[in-house]
Amino acid sequence: KKVYSFLKLKGCLPRNRFCNALSGPRCCSGLRCKELSIWASKCL
């Protein structure tokens, strides 16, 4: 659990545009995580 929380605070995973978040689908914009919209698979 400590590893997951650390990665969540860090932001984007290396070599991956998606964030390591278990709460739901998210994508990265730079080094920050943004939630995906419900109706589309694009970042808000």
From Swiss-Prot:
Keywords: Disulfide bond, Knottin, Neurotoxin, Secreted, Toxin. It comes from the Eukaryota. It is found in: Secreted. Disulfide bonds join 12-28, 19-33, 27-43. One of its GO terms (cellular component) is extracellular region. Coiled coil: none annotated. Expressed by the venom gland. The presence of a 'disulfide through disulfide knot' structurally defines this protein as a knottin. Insect active toxin causing rapid but reversible paralysis in crickets. No activity shown in mammals. Does not show effect on mammalian voltage-gated calcium channels. This is U2-agatoxin-Ao1s.
